Structure formats: structure tokens, C-alpha cells
Amino acid sequence: MISRSWLIAIALLIVSPAAAQTSESPVAWNAGVLTQSADWYSSSDARRIADTVVSHQSREGGWPKNTPLNEIARADADPGLANTFDNQATTLPLAFLARVATATGDATYAAAFRRGLDYVLDAQYPNGGWPQYYPLRGGYHDNLTFNDDAMVRVLNLLKAVAVGQQPYGFVDDAQRARATEAVSRGVEIILLSQVRQGDRLTVWCAQHDPVSLAPAWARKFEPPSLSGSESVGVVRFLMSLDEPSPEVVVAVEAAAAWFESSAIRDTRLETYTNAEGQPDRRLALSPGAPPLWARFYDLTTNAPIYMGRDSVAHPDLADIERERRMGYTYVGAWPASLPAEVEAWRRRVAE
């Protein structure tokens, strides 16, 4: 005789088929929304997310940062997060909407994309750079912003639009022409802002003054400096250009040489428990360890610098407060694969 518990289990399977199979996890709002299968972008789930993304679009045409755009916009949303290119804001929703618009043919998503694209193009400074926020807010937010790859993400998006790369084939000729011109001016400002030490070109700061192009401050612990992090994305963008100009070639080669000479060798970054029993980080001697790079380098000496909230430059990570050591990334392997990428680029350019 079948037991009562077995009968209950069978009944549950009948009334709830989902219990008999593994349900798919909902798609989170992050860069993963750009790497779904082609069929997914025409699904009801993709449309639902696209509808909420459109609902978050501002009057100006941009999007907020640090906001789950796959969820309904909150009435009490922080207006300070709106209209920015920081943390993949605006560029990520645009790339997502383009995929859904192409997959579904829905004019609503295409229109939201076009309005967002106009916002991106309107935000460009006459000299070719982009601020972190637009409309402008003042302070360091108005600087040309390479920080967290903001300008590089914008330029990569516009470059794809300009050539009609999928999923941007629905963009009309007028906007494509504007995108082409914007990329050209963007490349020009990148070349002009590359930091020069005498006759030697180096790399870039995470942010540059929009008028003088000098390396500029951001937050109290983000000084004018040579960036061992953001400069990597700039170099990769320059290497992505078809038929690079002689000036672009010089810029890439100079940056590659700077990265090679600025590596921190025989050192590892380790997490340990300090004397107070707290998790902490330090740089430790480690012969043969893979190279590391500092996020900030002195503009004159090229020495790594570490800065806490007191805005004082120090030569060692141990010299700043633990809160920053654990809460910010001062050292990393960002350019580790760059030598191989540069070598492949050289072969392509020589063809």
C-alpha cells in the first residue's frame, strides 16, 4: 500500500510542475545582461527588464548608477545617482536596450536607445572628453573621467554604433555620423591628455582637468597621478582602432614601455590578521611573484604612492589607515596580460 506521505509528494509534483525541475535564476542587473543567449533577448523576461530600464531613464536621457535597473524605480530614489557614466551607468542600459530592440523589433526600446545615445553625444565636451555626470554638477565630477573606465566605455559604445556593429544596426545614419565624429574627437583628447615627462610620454591620470587637461584630483584619496589601473583600458581602446594613426601607435608604445618599467616586482599583496585581530592587507616580499602595479604613481618620479583620507602621499601601503587598505584597491595586476595584447596588436598593425 502506498503511504500517505508518498501520496502527498505525488500530488505536489502534479500541482506544481516547477518542483520537479530546477528553475532558472532570474537575471541580475549587471554586465551579465549583455552575455545572455541570443534567443533570451526576445523573451518575456528580457522585455520585462527592458521595460523597467526604460522607466529609469531620466528626462535628460541618462541613467543612474548603483541602481538595480531590473526593478521598478523607487519614488525615493537618490537624485544624486542620476545621469552619470560612472560604474557602467548609461552605457550598460544602452547596450542592453539595443539587444532587446534588435531581437524584438519593438520601437519603444529603440526610441529609448536613440534618446540615450543623444544624451551621450550631447554630454561630450567640445574638446572630445566626457565628464562623470551630465548635466554638469561642479567639482571633480566635471573632470574628464577615465576613472573606472567611464570614458572608455562610452567610446567603445560609440565606436560600435559608428560602424553599425550589431546590435546597433537600427541606428540611423545621422546618429552614426555623430558617433563617428565623437569617437574621432575622443581619440584626439586621449592623445592630448597622455601625461608627458619632458620628452617622454607615459600614461594617463584617472581624471584630467577639462580645460588644462592636467591630471586632477577626485576624492581625497585619489590624487593627480599616473594610473596603473585606468590607463590599461585606455591603451586597450587605442589598440582596438582600425588603421591607427602614427600618433596612436606612439601613444600605445609609450604606455606599454611605462607599464613595463613601473611594475612592482618580487612582491605580493596579502590579506592577514593584524595584531588587533582584524583582517588587514600588506605588501610582502615574495621573490619570483607575478608583477603588480600601483593604482597611483607620482607624476614626476613614477614611484608608487598610497594615499588615505588625509590626502598625504605615502611610499608604502602600510602607511595609510587600515580602513582604506581594506576598502579600496591600491595595488593590482591590471596590465598583466597587456604585453601579450600589445605584441598581437603590433603584428596586426604591421600587416
Residues covered by each model-derived region:
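N-terminal carbohydrate-binding/catalytic regions of secreted carbohydrate-active enzymes
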Residues: 43, 47-91, 96
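A cross-kingdom feature marking solvent-exposed beta-strand/loop segments within repeated
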Residues: 65-85, 129-146, 211-223
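Bacterial N-terminal signal peptides
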Residues: 6-15
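Long, well-ordered core segments of solenoidal/helical folds
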Residues: 48-62, 112-129, 180-199, 251-268
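Terminal, non-catalytic domain-edge segments
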Residues: 21-49, 160-185, 212-218, 222, ...
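Positively charged n-region of N-terminal signal peptides that target proteins for export
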Residues: 1-5
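Long, hydrophobic/aromatic-enriched structural stretches that serve as scaffold segments
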Residues: 81-106, 112, 116-119
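Eukaryote-skewed repeat-based solenoidal scaffolds used as protein-protein interaction platforms
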Residues: 110, 114-117, 121, 138, ...
